[in-house]
Structures are given as C-alpha cells and as structure tokens.
Amino acid sequence: MGFRMANFLGDPFAISTVSFGVIAWIVAIAGAGSSASDNFPRFTWWGLVYEILLIIMVFLLYLNNTIELYKFTLVGLLSVGFLYTTNSTNNLIYSSNSGNLCCAAGCILLSMLNFLWIVYFGGHPESPSNQFIDSFAMKSSYAQQLPSEKNDDHEFAVPRSASGSQGFGVSDSRHSQLTNSKSGYMSSSQLNGLENFSHTNVQNTGTVGASNPASMPNTVYNTNGTNTADSNFAVPVSTFRYKARALYSYDASPDDINEISFVKDEILEVDDIDGKWWQARRANGQVGICPSNYVKLLD
C-alpha cells in the first residue's frame, strides 16, 4: 500500500496520541539532559530511547495503514515501555533536583500514553472503548474519500425526461445533488441508493438511457443486510483492486445505508483503502463501505 501521510492525518486518535507522545518525550529528555549525571538513574536513558522508538513505530504503522496487523505486538512492546516509564518516575519523583523532576513529569505523561495505547490496541474493535475512540475518525475519514471533481471515471449522468424532470422521477434538486462535480463532499443521505451496484448496470456509453426504463437491468443496493432490486438508478462501474478477508463479523448500522454487513472469514473486494472506511463489494454483488479494522488485505 505504501506510506501515505493521509493515513495518519485522517485518524484524529493517531494524531493526538503521537503528538502527545512526542511532547511528553521532549519534556522527559530535556529534564534528563539538565540533570547532573552523577545524580541521574542511568537506566532511564535507555527507557527514553526505547520510548521514542515505540512512538516512531506507531507513527510508521499508521502511515502504512498496517496498525491493525501489529496491534498485539505493540501491546507487548508498550507493556515493557510502561514498566520503564513508571520505574523511572518512581526513581526521579522524590528528587529535589529540578531536572530530575522535569524528567519525572515527562515519564508520567509517557506512562499515561502507554496505558492508553495498551487499552486501545489490546481491546477488541467491538469493545465500547474502541468504538468510542473510532467514532471520531471513521465517518469523517470516509467522507474525504468520496468522489470529487477530479475522479472523472466516477461521474455519471442522470437523464431528464421530456417534461423537464429527471428520468425515473428524480427531482431537480436531487439531480443537482447527484451530479454536482464541484463539491468534494457528499453526505450519506446524498448517496442513498447509489452505494451498491453491479457491473451490468451501466451502458458502455457511461450514461443511462431513460427511453425504456422497464428494459433496464435492476440495480442491487444496500439495505443493511437485505438485498432489494430497484430500477430507479444505475451507477458507474467501480474497479475493486484488492481483496480482503473479514477478521470479524460486522452488522451494518441501521442509521447508515452505505454500510454493508459481512461475516467472519468472508472474502471481500475492496478499494479506496485510505482511512478508516473502505469501499467494499461482497460476493453477491452488494457494495458499500466497511470498517478497515475489521478486514485484512490479502496478498
């Protein structure tokens, strides 16, 4: 997948915790540097080096969007770091030296960060704590991946009828929402009915004819677990470049028609794999979005 800064910047939890860790480490290393060498625990130096390596590792894993593949490894490494920082705090906090106290304050902050990461990376994706943290990033990160004006292959035309309204009973306001290529954002309500589609639903010309809607193939779209057929819309063909295996079962939220449900070990076709939400297609042709921490890319 390659390193992409968007993977890191699209996750508020990653930005806030890594930034907090860097600041806490700077406080600790500044205190250590200003302390007298004969009055400073030497093993604390190794603890600080170990801690910055952990922060860099988490940052790189977020950049590569592979944090979920190594979260159990991180829990073990962070547990060791938690012991280092708490032990250093105990050795420094009772000192009267200002440098030692500054380093102790930094170690306390690093201990708090290590504990938070242990709880998050060690928790199940469906746990209340993880879902609460992920809720701040999931929806916003997927909105940034929606089609924009520069994705010409995703644009399509909704035909108008002779009376001036769109074919298949689409209103003027609805048509302007669906075909507006100047906006880089579309809300989930604007995407209703457009999420799930099959390759047979688009003619080779890239537009939909409205002269004989009864003869057009039905479009299959998501109803959160129940596939229904509707001929109101035809949508563009999307290429799914990757395959992924479901690590856990997932039930689509009834409040978001864009989500799809799937079961553990199911093979999905996915695309737009930046951020927390990926575009996915099931074997039955159902298309929508899935949380990236529930699936694993296959080679």
Curated annotation (Swiss-Prot):
Extracellular side: 34-42, 87-100
Gene that specifies this protein: SHO1
GO cellular component: a single term: plasma membrane
Keyword flag Transferase: no
Subunit structure: Forms homooligomers.
Transmembrane segments: 13-33, 43-63, 66-86, 101-121
Function text: Plasma membrane osmosensor that activates the high osmolarity glycerol (HOG) MAPK signaling pathway in response to high osmolarity.
Family stated for the protein in its record: Belongs to the SHO1 family.
Limits of the SH3 domain: 239-299
Positions in the Cytoplasmic compartment: 1-12, 64-65, 122-299
Superkingdom as given in the UniProt entry: Eukaryota
A Pfam family this chain is assigned to: SH3_9
Membrane topology summary: Multi-pass membrane protein
Name of protein: High osmolarity signaling protein SHO1
